[in-house]
Amino acid sequence: MTTPRPIYIGCDPAFRAGGFWAAILDMEDKTIRFMSFDLLSWHDFLRSADAPPSCFICVENSNLQNKSFDMTGTKAEIARKGRNVGCNQAVSELAYRSAVLQYGARNVFQVSPKEKGVKITDTRVFFGIMKQEGILLPPGATNQDQRDAAKLALICQRKALLEGRFKADKVPQIRYNPAP
């Protein structure tokens, strides 16, 4: 029996007018597609017929870092930035919890912004990484949020494989008999 190739979803939640992006990496055909969500549509998608019945998800959870990044500006600007950070932390935590409720803690990872690492700002570098991984991108340009989500999907793949959460096909055991 062959185990179907896994699906990895990278989710970079944010609280903003345009919502946030998720990258869905399907290892069956090595394609990636991008979908835009707000928190409620993310929750609904995970429970819909359009969502994969089984997958691994990696959510960037800024709540893990619990830090305001930019403390420059007037008191009012700092307060506004603090509220924005708080909103993003709440959305991140709820997006993570929603995924865990649907797929279970074993299939859902969370990483802090620090653990996610630097952004891939150069599209040529991004396309090079995808080519190196053998992943087919949809036609057209990508934005920074899509590239971040794709990076999270790749992190998800590594974490699932390294932590042994994906059950690969059993390799038949070969017994060596040295006797003639």
Protein language model features and the residues they cover:
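Phosphate- and other anionic-substrate recognition elements at nucleic-acid/protein interfaces
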Residues: 2-180
